[in-house]
């Protein structure tokens, strides 16, 4: 292990692929699309997308707890733009369908009845043909600027949603509910308790990221307090909060913002976008190949299909901010999926998931039915289920309609399905947390480590099995009551008791490995303006008259520093004795896009990092770091700061 002689020498250690690419995890993520200016209507939506300035993000979150909703995100699409955005192929198809439906006299005798199977086959073929043709179609442009593709209206027949058989109409007597429904009074929206209001006065660069995450969760669940939520609902039962405020979540996403994303970014079917439907008791994914351009996506939507955006936080900076702040509180990856369902439709069959789900209703309405896990083994499930038939479900524990502004939480293993109403579409976000965060996951990491160490230490575990083992043990020999069988069983149990009890150090090591996994999965932090000037992101370099590089920052032993976030790094001692700092500062916006980022330090330098971890959220002077010399203290602090892990109390400028 090489000892760094200068701060610049303390470079990240990684695989050879990472070292070859100087821009790995940095330049690619920080590059922003060059968006053309359009009408005021488009600009108002662009402000909500990933190109939004950090100042607007900061302003948005500073208002979260004073105002129950953000500003209006878009204006109504003008009729002229709507007409211009429709393709000629779609006009011809819609006109042909209208003619076929209305011409009852001239063609009635010529038409023959088709079987349901034939109709379904033709419908599928028609969808595929249209989507394959439109996936290469560029958005219509006016004066060189692409227009937003409006929602194509299609008259859906009234009646049951497009799934068969459907759950019966809501019957309060049929609901086996122990779920508490919280209704927020309009006069109370946006109010928070006193300790939260006091926290708001803390300067951004002095705030505790874990507490900030709790406040965002409180905003989502209001008026349910977080302490009450974790006591009464978390991993136990569903919690439904109904509000009379459709604007509560509107600043996070809208239908028009989704359309802008499809136009301005390259999204592919299957990778970024799923098209799903649930008809005749069968769940189908209808993803074509290629890019998900608006005409293809809205064509599927008009045919009653649900649209799922798999990584909306990549493109929506406000949603990404919610996820990055919440991951500090939950100490795990916080995912987000976006679901857009047309009126009178259902996109997914009944199933359960392996995540704690927060359903945030942004637009429209959707009826949700939740059921108890079919088996006890499914409670707090670790793997998502397959699809259930309606006949396999018992009485719902909740049967309620979510309106815009409402939020529904339910734990892992809760079977659920959702259907839109006849005249209402639905746009909701599902935040997912605590996937693979159970004690079982810890033990799966811990026990192989314990066994390996025990085998190395104990010759008893390395001794060979008795020759007669296969003749006395096994399912076929359960009825054998011989003494040798009992002796072998006792020997195995004693070995487990004597050698496989994990020590405190073993548990620490296993938790470090799980935390290292979180560093690989986490979204990179969003550095706010007041933080940027205190971090490497605000540093600038220039050249003097001789061409030497001159940096605009310099540390001394009186400089005060702290970690950028509470969970920005993980100090891990690997099995070979090396000490590494794993972090997620340079992670990509796509899930595990790069190999894990880490920097290797000397074992004696670990104490300085441990002190920074324990001191958070407070600042320490560099002179307080427990290292032998001032030069070494400054060197270590500078290296951590240059990697984006530290923040100074005062800007250098």
From Swiss-Prot:
Catalyzed reactions per annotation: N(6),N(6)-dimethyl-L-lysyl(36)-[histone H3] + 2 2-oxoglutarate + 2 O2 = L-lysyl(36)-[histone H3] + 2 formaldehyde + 2 succinate + 2 CO2
SUPFAM superfamilies assigned: Clavaminate synthase-like (SSF51197)
PROSITE patterns, per the entry: JMJC (PS51184)
Start-end of Polar residues biased regions: 13-26
Region ranges (Disordered): 1-50, 65-137, 184-208
Domain JmjC: 300-450
A biological process term (GO) from this entry: circadian behavior
Cellular compartment(s): Nucleus
Cofactor: Fe(2+)
Sites where the protein binds Fe cation: 351, 353, 416
Source organism, top-level taxon: Eukaryota
Enzyme Commission number(s) of this protein: 1.14.11.-, 1.14.11.27
Gene Ontology molecular function, alphabetical: 2-oxoglutarate-dependent dioxygenase activity; histone H3K36 demethylase activity; histone H3K36me/H3K36me2 demethylase activity; histone H3K4 demethylase activity; histone H3K4me/H3K4me2/H3K4me3 demethylase activity; iron ion binding
Cofactor binding comment, as recorded: Binds 1 Fe(2+) ion per subunit.
Class of this enzyme: oxidoreductase
Residues with the Phosphoserine modification: 44, 131, 138
GO cellular component: nucleolus; nucleus
Residues modified to Phosphothreonine: 137
Biased composition (Basic and acidic residues): 194-208
UniProt keyword annotations, A-Z: Chromatin regulator, Dioxygenase, Iron, Metal-binding, Nucleus, Oxidoreductase, Phosphoprotein, Repressor, Transcription, Transcription regulation
One Pfam family from the record: RIOX1_C_WH
Family as reported in the entry's similarity comment: Belongs to the ROX family. NO66 subfamily.
UniProt-listed PANTHER family: MINA53 MYC INDUCED NUCLEAR ANTIGEN, RIBOSOMAL OXYGENASE 1
Protein function: Oxygenase that can act as both a histone lysine demethylase and a ribosomal histidine hydroxylase. Specifically demethylates 'Lys-4' (H3K4me) and 'Lys-36' (H3K36me) of histone H3, thereby playing a central role in histone code.
Protein name as annotated: Bifunctional lysine-specific demethylase and histidyl-hydroxylase NO66
Organism from which the protein derives: Drosophila melanogaster
């Amino acid at each position: 292990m090489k000892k760094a002689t200068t701060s610049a020498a303390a470079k990240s250690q990684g695989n050879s692929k990472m070292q070859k690419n100087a821009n790995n995890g940095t330049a690619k993520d920080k590059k922003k699309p060059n968006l053309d200016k359009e009408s005021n209507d488009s600009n108002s939506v662009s402000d909500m997308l990933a190109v939004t300035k950090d100042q607007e993000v900061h302003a948005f979150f500073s208002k979260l707890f004073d105002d129950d909703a953000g500003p209006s995100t878009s204006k109504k699409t003008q009729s002229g733009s709507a007409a211009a955005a429709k393709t000629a192929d779609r006009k011809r198809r819609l006109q042909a369908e209208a003619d076929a439906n209305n011409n009852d006299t001239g063609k009635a005798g010529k038409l023959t009845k088709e079987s349901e199977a034939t109709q379904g086959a033709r419908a599928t073929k028609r969808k595929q043909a249209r989507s394959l043709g439109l996936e290469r179609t560029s958005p219509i442009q006016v004066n060189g600027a692409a227009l937003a593709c409006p929602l194509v209206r299609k008259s859906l027949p009234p009646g049951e949603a497009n799934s068969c058989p459907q759950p019966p109409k809501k019957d309060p007597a049929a609901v086996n509910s122990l779920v508490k429904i919280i209704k927020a009074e309009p006069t109370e929206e946006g109010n928070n308790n006193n300790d939260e209001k006091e926290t708001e006065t803390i300067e951004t660069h002095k705030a505790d990221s874990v507490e900030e995450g709790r406040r965002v969760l409180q905003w989502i669940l209001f008026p349910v307090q977080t302490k009450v939520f974790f006591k009464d609902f978390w991993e136990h039962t569903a919690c439904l909060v109904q509000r009379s405020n459709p604007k509560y979540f509107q600043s996070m996403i809208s239908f028009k913002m989704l359309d802008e994303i499809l136009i301005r970014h390259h999204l592919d079917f299957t990778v970024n976008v799923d098209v799903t439907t649930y008809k005749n008791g069968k769940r189908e994914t209808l993803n074509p190949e290629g890019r998900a351009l608006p005409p293809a996506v809205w064509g599927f939507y008009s045919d009653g299909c649900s649209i799922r955006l798999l990584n909306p936080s990549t493109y929506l900076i406000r949603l990404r901010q919610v996820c990055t702040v919440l991951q500090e509180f939950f100490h795990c990856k916080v995912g987000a999926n976006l679901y857009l369902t047309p009126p009178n439709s259902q996109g997914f069959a009944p199933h359960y998931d392996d995540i704690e789900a927060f359903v945030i209703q942004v637009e429209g309405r959707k009826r949700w039915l939740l059921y108890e896990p079919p088996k006890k083994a499914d409670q707090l499930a670790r793997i998502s289920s397959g699809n259930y038939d309606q006949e396999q479900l018992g009485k719902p524990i909740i049967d309620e309609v979510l309106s815009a502004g409402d939020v529904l939480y339910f734990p892992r293993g809760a079977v659920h399905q959702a259907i839109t109403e006849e005249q209402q579409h639905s746009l909701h976000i599902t935040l997912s947390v605590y996937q693979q965060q159970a004690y079982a996951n810890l033990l799966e990491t811990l026990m192989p480590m314990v066994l390996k160490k025990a085998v190395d230490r104990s010759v008893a575990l390395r001794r060979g099995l008795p020759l007669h083992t296969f003749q006395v043990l096994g399912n076929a020999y359960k009825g054998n009551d011989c003494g040798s069988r009992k002796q072998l069983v006792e020997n195995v149990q004693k070995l487990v008791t004597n050698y496989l009890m994990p020590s405190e150090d073993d548990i620490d090591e296993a938790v470090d490995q799980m935390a290292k996994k979180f560093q690989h999965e986490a979204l990179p932090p969003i550095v706010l303006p007041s933080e940027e000037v205190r971090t490497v992101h605000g540093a600038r370099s220039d050249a003097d008259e001789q061409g030497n590089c001159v940096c605009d920052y310099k540390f001394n032993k009186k400089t005060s520093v702290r970690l950028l976030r509470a969970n920005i790094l993980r100090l891990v001692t690997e099995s070979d004795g090396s000490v590494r700092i794993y972090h997620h500062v340079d992670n990509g916006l796509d899930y595990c896009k790069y190999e894990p980022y880490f920097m290797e330090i000397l074992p004696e330098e670990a104490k300085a990092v441990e002190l920074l971890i324990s001191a958070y959220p407070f600042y320490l002077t560099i002179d307080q770091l427990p290292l032998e010399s001032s030069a070494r203290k400054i060197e270590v602090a500078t290296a951590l700061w240059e990697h984006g892990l530290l923040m100074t109390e005062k800007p250098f400028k």
